[in-house]
Each structure stands twice: as C-alpha cells, then as structure tokens.
Design a protein with these regions (language model features):
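Short, solvent-exposed loop/turn elements at domain surfaces
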Residues: 17-22, 55-57, 643-648, 701-704
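Beta-propeller-forming repeat regions
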Residues: 1-626
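Serine-esterase "nucleophile elbow" of acetyl-processing enzymes
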Residues: 627-696, 712-720, 724
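Structural recognition of the beta-strand scaffold that forms the well-ordered cores
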Residues: 47, 111, 373, 633-638, ...
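Alpha-helical cap/lid subdomain in secreted, periplasmic
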Residues: 709-810
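A structural motif corresponding to the C-terminal end of an alpha-helix
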Residues: 72-76, 238-248, 682-689, 753-765, ...
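Charged, often glycine-rich, active-site loop that binds/positions anionic groups
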Residues: 95-96, 698-714
C-alpha cells in the first residue's frame, strides 16, 4: 500500500509523566531504537527506549525517572513494555539493549542489564494486559534478603552515611591492608593524624563531613557532593534475555560487578570527583565469534578498568564463552591520582586494555579469518578472547610512550578500497597526554596510517563518500582528508551521524547545516546534493549529539531509513529515500557486520554502522559478495578410487572424474590440468555453475597426501564458499607400507589438517568413507570395507560438525 505522505508514522504509547523524590516533574521522550523480527513473519518489530527528560550522564548528579523499553508491531500494536525499575538509572550509559536472534529459532530476543524491580508487562492485540511479571532473581539473592521492593537510589544523606561507612572500614580495605593505599583517611587528604583506627562512628562521620565540605570542593568547585543524589551504588545487577514475545528466558548475575561506588575505578582520583562515573560505563554488542553464530558481548568500564564477557545463548541459557578483565589500575592515593587514565591494570595479560575503550564498540572481522573481533577503541579483542592489540605511541617529545586512550567516536569500515581489509578512524580524548588527537589506522594491526597530535579533546569525527572525484572514502574532524592523509579543499560536513540516502552510493549526514544553528531535527544533506530532507515536526535525541532514534536499512533497498520521533513523541516517523538509483544491491541488513552494527548502534554515543565492503559510487560490486560472483570449487582429496586418469590409463576410471556428470548432468564440461599445479595427475572440470578440482592421487594415504604438499596446494587456492571432499582409508590401513600407514585410532587426527585447511579459508569440508572393495557374500550382498576407518572418520566428522557421507551405505 503506497504511503500517503513522504514518511510512515508508527504510533507510540507514551509513558505517563512523573515526579522525582525531590519534587521535580519529568516527561518522556522516545530515545534509542532497534529492530528485530520477534515472530518470524518476515517483518521487523520496533524496539523503543523511553528516556525521561531528566535522564543524566553518569557524571551528572540528580534523580531520574524510570527507563522503559517498548516493543511495537509496525502498525503500532504494543506487544510489551519493560519497566527497568527503580534501580536502573536513566541515561545513555546505563541501558544498552541488544536485539538479535541469539538462539537461532528465527525470532529475535533482547538482552539487557536489569536489577531488582525490573518488570515486564505483556499485552494482547487489543491492549489488555496478558501478564505482568518481575524478572527472576537468583535464589542466593533472595536468601540474602534482596527483593523487588528494594530501592538503592541514594539521597544526599544516604551518600554521607555511605562515605562514613567507607571510612569506618578503611583499615580493612584490601588496598590498605596490602600497603598500596595510605593507612589512614587523613593521609589521603593530606592531613595530620587525628583519629584512632578502626574509626568509631562519630569520627567516620566527621571525616565524611570534611570530605564533603572541605576536601572535595578544594579539588574543584564543581565537586558539590552535598547534592550527590539519584545514583545507585549498591544492590544486585543482572543480565536478562527476553524472548521476542516478552517472556523471560534467563537471568544471571551481570558479569563483573561494580565492587564499589567507583573508588577502585578512579572516580575519586581526579580533580573532578565523580562517584559512580567510571564504574557505570557500559557497552554491549553482537559478534559472530565463530563465524557462524551470534554471541552477546557485555562490557563494563573503559576509562580505567575494562571488562568484557562473551556469551552464547544457543540453548536458551547464557553460557559464558570467555571473559576479559584488565584489572583495576593501581593508584597511590585513590583520592588524588590524576594519572589513573594513563596507567595499566593489574592483569598481566589484559592490563594494557585499561583506559583504551570508547563510548561504543564495533564488531567486525578485522583479521580476515572469517570470525568477528571486538574493536574496543584503541584496542581489539580477537574472536577467542585473546588480546589482538592495545595501541601505544610516542608523545611529541620523542621519548614518552603513552596509550592512545579513550575516544568519543569511532568508525570501522573499508575506508581504503585499494588496501586489503578494514580501517579504523578514531578521535581521542586525552589531549596533550595522548600521541594522537585523531588517526586513521589499519584495523588488523591497529597501526596508524596517518593522524595528528592535538592538545585538546576532539569529540567527533566522521567518514563517508562525500567527494566523487577522490578515490576511497573521506575522513574528517576539523579538515577533510583522503585515504592517504592528503587535505582536501572541501567544507567540513557535520559529524553526528551518517546516512546512505542518495542513489549514487554517496554518504549523507543527518545533522548538516541545521545542526550548526542548534535546531536539530534530522536534516539530511551533503556537499553535492545540498539539503535532501527536512523532517519538520520531528526531534532528535541526546542533546548536542542530535541522534535520530535509528538509522538503518529497515526497508531493504541498500539505502537507509531515518527513524526519528515526532516533536510530541506520539509516533516514530520512518523516512525513506525516493531518489532513483541505477544500482542494484541486496539489503544492507544481510551483511553480517552491518546487521550487528544496527544492534549495537544504541550504545551510549550512538555511532553509525557500516557494511563489511567498500560502499561508494566507485565500488567494485564483485567485491561485495565474492563467493556469489565466482563459481564455487569442489576440491577433491583422496586416493586411486577418486583419482582422474589419463586416456592411456583407460578403462580405469576414478569416481572423482565422473562427478561432474552427476553435478550438472549434460552440461558442457571443460576439463584441463590447472597450470600452476605441480602434480600432473590433477584435473580441473569447468561447469557453468561449478568447478571440480580433482587432486586425488593413487597410493596416497591421508598422511602421505599431506607430506607431499598436496593439501598445501589445495589450501593455497581454496576460497570462501568452496567445498573440500576428503576420502581416504584404503592406503592408511596398509601396515605393509609404513610410509602410508595410519592406525585407525589415529585416523581422525590425521584428517584434522584437511578440516582446518577448509575451515580457515571459509570453505566446507565433507568427509566420505572408504569405498567398498567388492567383497560379496553368497547372497550377493557387498560388505563395507575398512569398518574401523569408516567409523573413525564418522566420529571425527561428528566431533567437528562436518558432513559425513557413508559410501558403503545401502
């Protein structure tokens, strides 16, 4: 049905206004969004986070209203509403909701951080309530007396008493006991000894008052900690997976608990004392860590301590695959150590990860192994949880080595189409204490291609195809550069959010000229086309960041839709481009890197998502899906029964040279030896939609085939989307020839290199059992041969999850 206007409006049900404990009224605005098909009907549902207008950054004091997440059908039917509860503060850094089909059932789930008080309400299509249910708290927490009625949101008086309790227990703190922190609170504040330890309640309160009224303001006049209220620094924290229908599937403890109110995290160490700041910085993402299935990534911390955990949810239960913890950054004085952002954590392996993260993450296959990695700002985590790199550089003095450090914006994409792999464009916040203010880096190694030192915090950057006359994407902060670092004489576009809108595969920006005047309502423009959309009557989010609710290719023509809230928050407007295009390309949501990016776009400082391929007017479409633009090759590794034979050897024939007749019937087949193959018996069969490359050789076992370099030859040519059929056993079983012999109990391991060669190149390995030796019984029934080798192959195939063909089966 054609749209009546230039947009579609998805009706919303706005939560009721509220009042904080301080008597401050607040109202709600539709904020971040995500999409997922919750019922497998082929149509996305729309997930909307509601933020109160008093939602806060983690560094800002004050109460907030509750946060809600709704799930809507496209017609506006409310499927469910998740009330995050009283113990989840509202703000960009607290609630990252990952919408994806995590269990592979064809329906999207949602993973999100929860707490006591989080409650789900599910609705019937007519709006009546089907159920209202709190999340399931672990039995250990119920036994400890926690309940959904608990409220851990602090008042100013609560915080005063909390600090008194911290001081009263000072002598028992592990850092004090181990001699790493001053033995007394007075020493931390630079005071002469005044009190006996352990402190009594009165002395602890006296020190708390001194801290609030004297010490903290002396560090910075902005440290008005008598007004510290609205934060949560106590109580359980959970990670919950909800089904698309709103049913709770599993709840576990959130990985890496807060431990304290930020004291160990460095929240009291800087001149600006900001309790509950660094400790409550969360990120989340989705990554195909094994190249085949989606995993949830849950993160906490990036200014100092950095932690990440990876979970699979394949069996409707969280299963932790790996965890990473930099450890806390050591401080000589937790109340005065401004170098904590620059130091490393205590973990001997992951310590250098500390302080390197951003306000978002990216997930992409940056090393070309078919598995996705996590780009954590200036660091990268390999798919197996190992640290790929954490980047350091040299300051302008030429001597001092420093970490790249935290940054606010990052883009991971194929920026330079003439350089293999992906690139990263990043800004960095540490100013004069960091080697770069911005840099373009190689994604696989993290090495800088070009960049500049900057003494100030650079908060934004962007990439995109904005100059049709320059090869590659362009990158910009203050100036615009090409992929080689050459400054282009172009006006600098906005840096809030990119969008693919035009029909010429160029890049547009959603803030543009209107952002410069402070009236943010999602204007789309670029340097070539000018203003392309003015969505009047709408509003963007997150203050000066001017974020739409979502930018994603939700309708499926390889351009992106702009999803923004109406100014009165009664609807989400979905704008789609009507610009004609001569290009054909699949929906971007079918590119795994892009689809995962749509899931993590709602992280903190919303960042654009990019496909895994170079997206621009000068793109080579053959590089988009190379496995679909080239014929797959079926490689064959085996012995005499599979081998191709020369005309002089006839009538001897191996089944490998006859396979093409079964693969594509009477199709014309061109058979020839591959020119670069060093083995003369190899034969290549070219069919209209398939190539069969038969590398089998008589007299070879799985062992000698490898030792002669025949598998190496296959590995040098096999590509993603190819197949490798492996069939050995006859010669492996020949005890009389030791050079060939492989015992049956070692046969599986002898096959493993074949599996590894295929798997590492994105190909599929298929195992076929030894062919029977024409041994018939009196009834004329052929008996399978080499049973032990057949079963060993079957077992190995089952172990690695490879297809197995029993050639001896009836």
């Amino acid at each position: 049905k054609p749209w009546q206007k230039g947009y579609y409006e998805l009706p919303l049900q706005k939560p009721a206004d509220g009042v904080t404990p301080a008597g401050e009224p607040f109202a709600y605005h539709a904020n971040d969004m995500s999409v997922g098909d919750i019922d497998n009907d082929g149509e996305y549902e729309y997930f909307v986070k509601w933020d109160p207008d008093n939602s806060h950054d983690v560094s800002i004091k004050g109460y907030t209203g509750r946060c809600f997440i709704d799930c809507y059908k496209l017609d506006g039917t409310l499927v469910w509403r998740l009330d995050m509860g009283q113990n989840i503060r509202a703000g960009a850094h607290y609630t990252q909701f990952m919408v994806y089909d995590f269990n592979g059932d064809g329906r999207a789930e949602m993973a999100v951080k929860t707490a006591p008080g989080t409650v789900m309400t599910r609705f019937a299509p007519d709006g009546t309530v089907l159920s209202r249910r709190y999340i399931t708290m672990p039995q250990k927490d119920l036994d400890a007396g926690y309940s959904h009625a608990d409220n851990y949101v602090c008042t100013a008086q609560d915080y005063r008493l909390h600090m008194a309790e911290v001081f009263r227990r000072w002598h028992t703190h592990p850092e004090v006991v181990n001699g790493r922190w001053p033995a007394t609170v007075e020493q931390c504040f630079g005071l002469a000894p005044q009190y006996a330890y352990p402190l009594c309640e009165a002395d602890a309160l006296a020190l708390a008052d001194y801290f609030l009224d004297v010490y903290a303001p002396s560090r910075s006049p902005k440290n008005e900690l008598r007004k510290f209220e609205g934060f949560v620094y106590d109580g359980p924290e959970y990670l919950t997976m909800f089904g698309g229908d709103g049913a709770e599937l599993d709840t576990i403890d959130y990985p890496y608990p807060r431990v304290d109110d930020g004291l160990l995290w460095g929240d009291y160490a800087m001149p600006r004392i900001e309790p509950c700041n660094r400790v409550d910085r969360f990120n989340a993402g989705v990554a195909y860590l094994d190249g085949e299935r989606p995993y949830l990534i849950a993160c906490r911390g990036y200014y100092t301590r950095a932690t990440l955990a990876a979970y699979d949810f394949f069996e409707n239960r969280f299963h932790k695959v790996w965890g990473i913890d930099s450890g806390f950054v050591p401080m000589a004085n937790p109340f005065n150590d401004s170098g904590c952002h620059l130091a490393v954590g205590t973990d001997p392996v992951y310590g250098i990860l500390a302080g390197q993260g951003n306000h978002s993450i990216s997930t992409a296959d940056i090393d070309g192994d078919g598995c996705m990695e996590i780009v954590y700002g200036a660091a990268a985590i390999d798919h197996d949880g190992s640290l790929l790199y954490s980047k350091y550089g040299t300051l302008p003095d030429g001597r001092t080595r420093a970490k790249f450090g935290h940054g606010d914006a990052m883009h991971v994409a194929d920026i330079d189409p003439d350089s293999p792999g992906l690139e990263i464009f990043n800004v960095y916040e540490e100013g004069e204490r960091a080697p770069y203010g911005w840099a373009l880096r190689d994604a696989e190694t993290g090495d800088v291609r070009f960049g500049e030192y900057a003494e100030e915090d650079l908060g934004r950057c962007m990439i995109g195809k904005i100059d049709p006359n320059t090869r590659g994407l362009q990158v910009w902060v203050k100036d615009v550069y090409d992929v080689n670092g050459r400054t282009l004489e172009l006006p600098t576009p906005g840096t809030n959010m990119k969008i693919y809108w035009a029909g010429d595969l160029s890049t547009q920006i959603t803030d543009g000229a209107d952002y410069l005047y402070g009236n943010q309502y999602g204007v789309i423009n670029d340097l070539t086309h000018g203003v392309m959309l003015q969505p009047a009557g709408t509003a963007t989010n997150n203050g000066t960041k001017g974020n739409p609710c979502l930018v994603a290719d939700v309708l499926g023509d390889f351009r992106e839709e702009l999803l923004v809230r109406t100014a009165d928050d009664t609807a989400i407007r979905i704008y789609t481009t009507t610009n004609l295009t001569p290009h054909k390309l699949f929906t971007l949501m079918h590119d795994v890197q892009y689809r995962c990016g749509v899931a993590w776009q709602n992280n903190c400082y919303n960042q654009p998502c990019y496909p895994s391929f170079y997206y621009a007017g000068d793109m080579d479409f053959a590089n988009v899906l190379p496995q679909l633009n080239a014929k797959p090759t079926l490689w064959m590794a085996g012995d005499s029964i599979m081998q191709s034979y020369a005309p002089g050897d006839k009538p001897v024939t191996g089944w490998g040279e006859m396979l093409h007749t079964l693969a594509q019937g009477d199709a014309v087949c061109c058979a020839a030896h591959r020119a670069d193959c060093p083995f003369p018996q190899e034969m290549r069969y070219e069919l209209p939609g398939l190539v069969i490359d038969n590398c089998a050789m008589a007299g070879r076992s799985s062992k000698t085939f490898r030792e002669e370099g025949r598998l190496d030859d296959i590995a040098a040519h096999i590509r993603p989307g190819d197949l490798l059929v492996v069939s050995f056993g006859h010669n492996d079983a020949n005890r009389a020839k030791a050079e060939r012999y492989v015992p049956a109990d070692a046969f599986g391991e002898s096959l493993r290199p074949f599996w590894d060669a295929a798997r590492s190149h994105g190909a599929v390995c298929i195992f076929a059992s030894p062919v029977a030796m024409r041994e018939f019984d009196e009834a004329g029934v052929c008996h399978p041969s080499f049973a032990a080798y057949r079963e060993a192959m079957r077992a190995f195939a089952a172990e690695v999850g490879a297809p197995f063909i029993d050639l001896g089966a009836a």
